[in-house]
Amino acid sequence: MSKAMPIAACGMAAVKQMQSLTLPWPSKDLSPNARVHWTRRSKAVKQARGYAEIMARRAGWGGLSLPVEGRLDLWISFYPPTRRLPDDDNMLARFKPYRDGIADALGIDDRRFVSHPLVEDDRRTGGEVVVRITGIE
């Protein structure tokens, strides 16, 4: 029998299912296909990583007690700003600074994440990325 505390008793989503986190559409400067100067890309990475960390902490993800080891599923839904659907590989690369910022907020190494990207057919003004984390048992 597991000694883990039930989700409801902990007052947090004990990694079974966490609340979703909504982030803005990633900058085109983060695309692996972008031909931008390295300083511009570096600035975009730093800004995106910091923003994701702040938003994850505001969402209450910074205080979660996570298992010490094991993998965590990272469900990423991309809602593009236009009808043009980007490929999921490019979007995952553009999402990497967000992933690092979320890992920073959780206090874990981002190697623990198993990414599940999905480019949605729905359009959202300005585009957005919705992230959920679930535990793998």
UniProtKB/Swiss-Prot annotation:
GO terms for biological process: DNA recombination; DNA repair. GO terms for molecular function: endonuclease activity; magnesium ion binding. The keyword Ligase does not apply. InterPro entries: RusA-like_sf (IPR036614). Keywords: Endonuclease, Hydrolase, Nuclease. The keyword Cytoplasm does not apply. Belongs to the RusA family. This is Uncharacterized protein XF_1666. It comes from Xylella fastidiosa (strain 9a5c). The lineage of its organism: Bacteria, Pseudomonadati, Pseudomonadota, Gammaproteobacteria, Lysobacterales.
